[in-house]
Amino acid sequence: MAPQANQDLQHGAFRQYLPDLSTPRFTTIAQNDAYGHARELKDKHAPPWLHGLYVHWRKLFEEPFKGITNDGVVRPGLFKLRDEGVPIERIVAAAQAVVGQLTPAQASKTILHIDSPEWRSWSNPEFLLSDKGIRLDEIAPSLRDGVLAVLRETLSPEGYDKAVGAMRINHFLGELVNARRVMNEHSYNFVLFGAAPSTTRPWGFSFYGHHLCLSVFLYKTQIVVSPWFTGAEPNLIDAGPYKGTHILDVEERLGLRLMQSLSAETQDKARVYRLMKDPAMPKGRWNHDDQRQLCGAYRDNRVVPYEGVTVSSLGAEQQGLVVQIIEQYLLYLPARARALRLEDVKAVFDETYFSWIGGSGDDDAFYFRIQSPVIIVEFDHHSGVFLTNGEPAKFHIHTVLRTPNAGDYGWALRGQIDGALNQDYVWEG
C-alpha cells in the first residue's frame, strides 16, 4: 500500500474511538459554555492532572522571561533587525479596523502593553484558562471577520489556510463530542499588544484556543511568529461541509521518511527512547497533557538539552528532508520572511540535532524534535483526550515551534529597537 494511502487510513481510524456521550464528563460539557467549563477545572479541579499542570503553569508564569536554552545560558547575537518584506501597511490597516470596532470594555481587555507578561499566558487545552481579549464566538460577525482579516493579512496564504483548517477541525471535534459551545470554529481569543498597530513601532498579537495558538510580533517589515502550537484530534474531517480538511500530515510523512532513511546505526543514535512512555524516562519527561512535548505552553524558560544526531552528520538527502520539515513549520510566515528564516536555520546545521522517540515503522506512533540555537520544532502523536484511544495514535497530533535564546515573542529584537525597552510600564500585582 502506498504510504500516503496508508496514512489516510490511519487518520480516518478515529471513529472507532468515539466516546460514550452519556457519561458525566460529556453530559456536563454539553451543558457548559467556555466559562462554565473553565470553572470545572479551576474550582472543581477536574480533571485533577490538568489542574495540577495548570497550577504548575501559573508558577512558571511568575518567572521573568528568559527564553528556552539548551544549557541554561542565553546565547546573544543570534537575531538581528532586518527587512523581511512583510506587508505591514495592510496588516496595520486590518488591525486598526478591529480597534475601531471595539467598545471601551472590549478595548480594555484587548489592547495590552507591548511588554505585558500576558504574551505568555496562552495555552492549548480547550479550557479558557486566560480570559483576555475578545473571543470570536461572542462578538459581532463584522468584528470577527475583522480579526480573521488580521490573520489573513499577516500570515502566508498557505499558513492562513492551515490555521483555518485547525479551527474547522476543532469545530468538528466539538460536534463529535457534543461540546459545541466550548469547541467550535470561533472558540479563540484575540489580544493586541502595543499602544496601537503601527508601521514604525513594535506591536503584535496573540490568537489562541484549543489546538491553535499563535504569538505574532511585528516591527516595521519584520515578523516573528513564535511560539506557536498547532494540533488536531482527529486531524481529518470525514463528514460535513468541510469534509476532506486535514492538517499536519505532511510533517508526519516527512518526519517518518527522514527516520526511515537513516542507517540502523544512526537510527539508534537518534532514538532517545524506544517506547512512547518509556520506563527509562526520568520524572517529568512525560506528563498526561504535554506527553512527550517539552516546549509547550508556559515553558518559556525551559532548559532542553540537545539529543540525538547532528544534522550536519547526515547525508544530503537527509538534510534535504530536514529542510522540508522546517519549511512546514515556517509555513505561517510570509514567503520572504520564511526564506530568510530557513537560511538562518541552515546556517547552523552543525549545531542542529534530530531526535526521535518511539518506533519507526509505517504504523508506529512517534515523536521527533529538531533543535538548534535558532529553532526548535516538535511533533508528537498523542493518546486520546476526547477520543478513547489509550495509546498514541496517528489521528491525534500536537506540533510546536519555539525560537530559543530569547527569540520567542520577538524578545531578542526588542533591545535593538530604539526606545522599545525604555518603558514606564507599571506591573500589576
Identify what each model region corresponds to:
Residues A2-S156, D161-G429:
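A cross-kingdom marker for long, charged
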